[in-house]
UniProtKB/Swiss-Prot annotation:
Signal peptide: none annotated. SUPFAM superfamilies: CcmK-like (SSF143414). One of its GO terms (biological process) is propanediol catabolic process. Induction: BMC production is induced by growth on 1,2-PD vitamin B12 medium. Residues 11-96 form the BMC domain. This is Bacterial microcompartment shell protein PduK. It holds the Pfam family BMC. The lineage of its organism: Bacteria, Pseudomonadati, Pseudomonadota, Gammaproteobacteria, Enterobacterales. InterPro entries: BMC_dom, BMC_shell, CcmK-like_sf, CcmK/CsoS1_BMC.
Length: 160
């Protein structure tokens, strides 16, 4: 029993609030109030809700979530909060984002090679360029963003 190493089980805390500014403020207050690790600050689907995910020992996570929930409640932005004291084996691994690999941008010579490989038939010719987004007529002198009255087809709409 002396050979077994004693590990402190990490707990998971979730705080859902309304709005990015409130989420950042809550994460700041929670990090200052207890010894926790901020896992993620995620946008949820709809309503502008944000989820703050933290880990740490059980007491620290409970204290941080309580502090963050109280602060969010003062600003009328608390949606939900939850502390999972001993999450399952795969939960924390699934929650931890993997480091993203940033690919280097292609150099100008590589871009030129790709452009030269494209068939010339697909590129629109100078005379086929459409400047009017209303009538899509290449002969129309109107440019996108100019008044509709400049379109050569402006008086012909809705006629059968």
């Amino acid at each position: 029993m002396a050979n077994k190493e004693h590990r402190v089980k990490q707990s998971l805390g979730l705080l859902e609030v309304c709005g990015l500014a409130l989420a950042i403020s809550c994460a700041d207050i929670m990090a200052k109030s207890a010894s926790i690790t901020l896992l993620a600050l995620e946008k949820t689907n709809g309503s502008g809700w944000m989820v703050i995910k933290i880990t740490g020992d059980v007491a620290s996570v409970q204290a941080a979530i309580t502090t963050g929930a109280h602060f969010a409640e003062q600003w009328n932005g608390l949606v939900a909060h939850k502390v999972i004291a001993r999450p399952g084996e795969g939960i924390l691994l699934a929650e931890t984002p993997s480091p993203s690999v940033i690919e280097p941008e292609p150099e100008a010579s590589e871009i030129a090679d790709v452009v030269s490989e494209a068939p010339a038939e697909e590129a629109p010719q100078e005379s086929e360029l459409v400047s009017c987004n209303l009538c899509l007529d290449p002969k129309c002198p109107r440019q996108k963003g100019e008044p509709r009255t400049l379109c050569i087809h402006s008086g012909k709409r809705g006629e059968a």
